[in-house]
Design a protein with these regions (language model features):
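Structured binding elements
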Residues: 96
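Conserved coil-to-alpha-helix start sites within the AMP-binding
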Residues: 84-89
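Phosphate-binding glycine-rich loop
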Residues: 32-77, 91-93, 101-103, 126, ...
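N-terminal "arm"/small-domain region of PLP-dependent enzymes with the aminotransferase-like
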Residues: 1-30, 356
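PLP-dependent aminotransferase class I/II
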Residues: 34-41, 50-51, 114-118, 125-129, ...
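Active-site phosphate-binding strand-loop segment of PLP-dependent enzymes
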Residues: 107-196, 201-203, 208
Length: 379
């Protein structure tokens, strides 16, 4: 194949430039303006649940502002999912707090509710206080067992900051991911379901919290004619130009989600009955993943190969793949942090690959990808 097949490239609707041109024509080229307001309104309507949304410079910024508003600070502990990208945990460290890592369960690959409760009890026993927040992730767009996680959080009166950066449009029991916790986080990085070039959003419970979030995101400037600052603030607001890209992307969001699910369905059919290759799919009818990235596990015993050999061979054949996230409790930067593990994430990391699923991936591409994977795995 002459072309290279990528995991998930940005796909423009064709309407983005109109919103950007309007921003230039009206000189709204700053981190506020009509595009920002409209983009936030469109996201609010999409996620539902009477939530408000604040557009920000990154999903990482959204996590950081959520933690700040939950009062996370020096000496606190925040329970974090281990099997995920570092941006979920790093903002905890920004605040001088300590991430406590929880391993995954098999059904969704997300935070294990059983380990979560064990960890809460153990942290209370060892530190004399409960964790300040719980930060589950909907990995690769697969909803976590968020009902169980939220029930445990409510039992111990610990707020939930929900990382739905990879899960825009994913649902659990018909409710959008990112709307279950006190706060929810979205990402619009260049490889996500929609993009604003770079950007993110914080889903908040009400209008007053939205105003407070915007206050922190604009350097915590007080309402004085001069520049008055009584709290530490941040430069986290989204540009009106980037929000224009987001508005154009919102017109094809449903189409993007449908395409990712279609590609996954093709993979599901193609890998059915293939010994040694397991495609990750919804555990049951409560889960409705957006399948931001499709993921497979490669059993080295049954296939006679391993995920890294397959990755290298596919790369030579023009197919981009990526290993699954290396668990945070194995990362050198967090080597001394408390962790509660069951072996699931380490096993997944040593067996798994992300395979192409984005809007540019065609049905013919899927046929080629599957053929190449099967060819790599023949004993």
């Amino acid at each position: 194949m002459d072309k290279r097949i990528y995991l998930c490239l940005a796909h423009m609707s064709g309407k983005e430039q109109g919103f950007i041109k309007e921003a230039f024509d009206t000189n709204w080229v700053v981190p506020l303006g009509p595009n920002v307001n409209a983009f936030e309104d469109e996201l609010k309507h999409f996620v539902g649940q009477d939530k408000e949304v604040v557009a920000l410079s990154a999903g990482t910024a959204a996590i950081h502002l959520g933690l700040i508003q939950l009062g996370v600070g020096a000496g606190d502990e925040v329970i974090c999912q281990s099997f995920t990208f570092c941006a979920s945990a790093n903002p905890v460290a920004y605040q001088g707090a300590k991430p406590v890592f929880i391993d995954s369960e098999e059904d969704t690959w997300n935070m294990d509710p059983v380990l979560l409760e064990e960890a809460i009890k153990d942290r209370i026993l060892k530190t004399g206080k409960k964790p300040k927040a719980i930060l589950p992730v909907h990995l690769y767009g697969m909803p976590a067992r968020i009902d169980e996680i939220c029930a445990i959080a409510a039992k111990y009166e610990i707020p939930v900051l929900e990382d739905a950066a990879e899960a825009l449009g994913s649902e659990f029991k018909g409710q959008k991911c990112g709307t279950f916790g006190t706060f929810g986080v979205l990402s619009f990085n260049g490889n996500k379901m929609i993009t604003t070039s770079g950007g993110g959003a914080l889903i908040v419970p009400d209008e007053s919290t939205k105003k407070q979030t915007m206050f922190y995101a604009t350097q915590a400037r007080e309402p004085f004619p001069h520049y008055q600052h009584e709290k530490i603030g941040y430069n986290y607001r989204m540009s009106n130009i980037c929000a224009g890209i987001g508005r154009g992307q919102m017109t094809v969001l449903d189409e993007h989600i449908a395409h990712h699910r279609h590609v996954h369905a093709l993979y599901e059919n193609a890998f059915e009955g293939v010994d040694g290759i397991t495609l990750k799919s919804n555990p049951d009818g409560r889960f409705n993943a957006n399948y931001w990235l499709s993921t497979i596990l490669i059993d080295p015993v049954k296939t006679g190969t391993n995920y890294d050999e397959v990755r290298r061979k596919l790369d030579e054949r023009g197919i981009e793949t990526r290993p699954l996230w290396k668990p945070m409790h194995l990362q050198p930067v967090y080597a001394t942090n408390p962790c509660y593990v069951n072996g699931v994430s380490e096993r997944l990391f040593n067996m798994g690959l992300c395979i192409p699923a984005g809007p540019w991936v065609t049905d013919e591409d899927v046929v080629y990808i599957v053929e190449q994977i099967k060819g790599c795995c023949k004993k």
